[in-house]
């Protein structure tokens, strides 16, 4: 813009210099008709000298108005670029059809790095937000896990022990000679206590699931089955093939196994549960099957938290999750997870 201002100033200086020269010549050469006519002839009743000044002033006003319009265009464009920058958009110079002054370009070249820095700050803010979300998610999960552990300890130390004591007392009472109707009621009470103990063990397994730690999936399932065989009246058996399972899916499969056994203990009313794990070359098959009362899959699948949790865990590892259950014929849960041969045998 400076070169426009300098041009106007130079033009004014030139015109007034010429007028001064004409005036000087008029004083010296008063007999020259041209200069006399120049300074004494009138146009529209206005001396030529004054008329020329008015023309020059009018031209300056017109040129100044044009420059002011262009400057306003520059300011509007810069304002738009700043607003776009504040909104996170990338500013550019290719989307406008106005003439850019050197001063505006200087300001624009200052704005571009600021826009880039602002974009970086926005990305950092998003990353921090995501990190905070992940941290909060981990904290929430940790709080939930701690609360589950606390509830499991309280149930084990109080209710579970009381149920055990009640079971022992009822067993001792059964050894004595009972008169009717106690001889019929005591066995019923004993059965109720045993069912409560079974329900309690299933709840404890759900609230305080065992981790694999340094064990493989097969070893973890075997240890789980052996532990349950000592604590529950239901027959728990396993058939586990010895093969390497990718670390990324082992924990999910183990938690699915725990959840399935817990549901079986609590709801199946069966006498036997079987856990099977097979290597089918390109996929593994995990199957948990019982001989209980069965249920309507369509009704239970959306209502049961345990079933939905198992299905979600299977989907997270790219596995398929199927349930087959028939009334009085038991329930079979199958999980098929794809195996990557290279990952399966990596240490």
UniProtKB/Swiss-Prot annotation:
Main subcellular location of this protein, as a coarse class: membrane
Alphabetic keyword roster: Antibiotic resistance, ATP-binding, Cell membrane, Kinase, Membrane, Nucleotide-binding, Phosphoprotein, Transferase, Transmembrane, Transmembrane helix, Two-component regulatory system
Coiled-coil segments on the chain, per record: none
GO MF assignments: ATP binding; phosphorelay sensor kinase activity; protein dimerization activity
Induction entry: Induced by antibiotics (teicoplanin, ceftizoxime, imipenem, bacitracin, D-cycloserine and vancomycin).
PTM field: Autophosphorylated on His-156.
Domain named Histidine kinase: residues: 150-341
The keyword Nucleotide-binding belongs to this UniProt entry's keyword annotation: yes
Protein topology in the membrane: Multi-pass membrane protein
A biological process term (GO) from this entry: response to antibiotic
UniProt-listed Enzyme Commission number(s): 2.7.13.3
Pfam families: HATPase_c, HisKA_3
Catalysed transformations (reactions): ATP + protein L-histidine = ADP + protein N-phospho-L-histidine
One GO CC term on file: plasma membrane
EC top class named in words: transferase
Phosphohistidine: modified positions: 156
Domain of life: Bacteria
Subcellular location: Cell membrane
InterPro entries in the cross-refs: HATPase_C_sf, LiaS/VraS, Sensor_HK_TwoCompSys, Sig_transdc_His_kin_sub3_dim/P
TM stretches of this protein: 13-33, 43-63
Protein purpose: Member of the two-component regulatory system PprA/PprB involved in biofilm formation by controlling the expression of many related genes including type IVb pili major subunit flp pilin, adhesin bapA or cupE fimbriae. Also modulates quorum-sensing signal production acting on both negative and positive modulators. Functions as a heme sensor histidine kinase which is autophosphorylated at a histidine residue and transfers its phosphate group to PprB.
UniProt protein name: Sensor protein VraS
Species the sequence originates in: Staphylococcus aureus (strain N315)
